[in-house]
UniProtKB/Swiss-Prot annotation:
Keywords: ATP-binding, Cytoplasm, Fatty acid biosynthesis, Fatty acid metabolism, Lipid biosynthesis, Lipid metabolism, Metal-binding, Nucleotide-binding, Transferase, Zinc, Zinc-finger. It is an enzyme of class 2 (transferase). One of its GO terms (molecular function) is carboxyl- or carbamoyltransferase activity. Belongs to the AccD/PCCB family. GO terms for biological process: fatty acid biosynthetic process; malonyl-CoA biosynthetic process. It is found in: Cytoplasm. Pathway: Lipid metabolism; malonyl-CoA biosynthesis; malonyl-CoA from acetyl-CoA: step 1/1. Acetyl-CoA carboxylase is a heterohexamer composed of biotin carboxyl carrier protein (AccB), biotin carboxylase (AccC) and two subunits each of ACCase subunit alpha (AccA) and ACCase subunit beta (AccD). This is Acetyl-coenzyme A carboxylase carboxyl transferase subunit beta. Residues 28-290 form the CoA carboxyltransferase N-terminal domain. Component of the acetyl coenzyme A carboxylase (ACC) complex. Biotin carboxylase (BC) catalyzes the carboxylation of biotin on its carrier protein (BCCP) and then the CO(2) group is transferred by the transcarboxylase to acetyl-CoA to form malonyl-CoA.
Length: 290
């Protein structure tokens, strides 16, 4: 009847309380953006932050990268005290830098130092995209240049892992100058027969991809890494064509001759050790080739 419409009890849906939503502590579980599988974060970390289901490579910070590659207690960091200023007086730039320092416990977007990989010495630079998206400013360029000069001085190989959104806009032309400075340092190092190994990780874009990231004697990348200078949309608008779906991926660049290899993270240490062995001893340690 008509009156029943107004007298009938309403049905309500129960909404979880805020407390119930947070019963699982933040960071305990991680969802893979590729296959959507949910896994324990600690298990993901044990697997070098590679999805156990589909092989997707999650980003690594500098500390995780060092622990996965270098021999235990072999890493000696240098120039860690260098910090960015605000030469152009860009609004709120220093405040953003300070927030990233607190969040990451880093002073800048690259960590440099010397260590050993399976006993073979090298100077290594590792960019960290958790700090200002790994953008390249004056300090990043200077630290990388000093690391290259250190490798030249000690006559050991130079290895760099890149992860960057490109030049840091808050430093304007000073950030663009780092492209030339780092490239010049690599040129001088190469003239002294120094070995340069570049490993591009997701993402490596902008001025970083157009300078030191692409200047290795060996240019490698992790699977699925985005590598490029300009964005996909800008390129499509400029050339008036639709680009392939896998355009600007590590696999696409390998197929077109712009990379020497795409290396799974679980194999990275052994592959690097093999190259260091080959260039430093002539390949005495045959076990590395197995």
């Amino acid at each position: 009847m008509l009156k029943d419409i107004f007298t009938k009890k309403k049905k309500y849906a129960s909404v979880p309380s805020e407390q119930a939503k947070h019963d699982v502590p933040e960071g305990i579980m991680t969802k893979c953006p590729k296959c959507k599988k949910i896994m324990l974060t600690k298990e993901l970390d044990k697997n070098l932050r590679v999805c156990m289901n589909c092989g997707h490579h999650f980003p690594m910070n500098a500390k995780q990268r060092i622990e996965s590659l270098l021999d235990e207690d072999s890493f000696e960091e240098f120039n860690q005290g260098m910090i960015s200023e605000n030469p152009l007086g860009f609004p709120e730039y220093l405040e953003k830098i300070e927030k990233d320092r607190e969040k990451t416990s880093l002073n800048e977007a690259v960590v440099t130092g010397k260590g050993t990989i399976s006993g073979f010495p090298a100077v290594i630079a590792i960019m960290d995209s958790t700090f200002r998206m790994g953008s390249m400013g004056s300090v990043v360029g200077e630290k990388i240049t000093l690391a290259i000069e250190k490798a030249k001085e000690e006559k050991v190989p130079f290895i760099i892992f890149t992860a960057s959104g490109g030049a840091r806009m808050q430093e304007g032309v000073l950030s663009l100058m780092q492209m030339a400075k780092t490239s010049s340092a690599l040129k001088l190092f190469s003239e002294e027969q120094g070995l340069i190994i570049s490993v591009m990780t997701h993402p490596t874009t902008g001025g970083v991809s157009a300078s030191f990231a692409s200047l290795g004697d060996y240019n490698f990348a992790e699977p699925g890494t985005l590598i490029g200078f300009a964005g996909r949309r800008i390129i499509e608008q400029t050339i008036g064509e639709k680009l392939p779906e896998d355009f600007q991926t590590a696999e696409f660049l390998l197929k077109h001759g712009q990379l020497d290899a795409v290396i799974h993270r679980n194999d990275m240490k052994d592959k690097l050790a093999f190259l260091l062995d080959m260039h430093q001893t002539g390949g005495e340690y045959e076990w590395l080739q197995d």
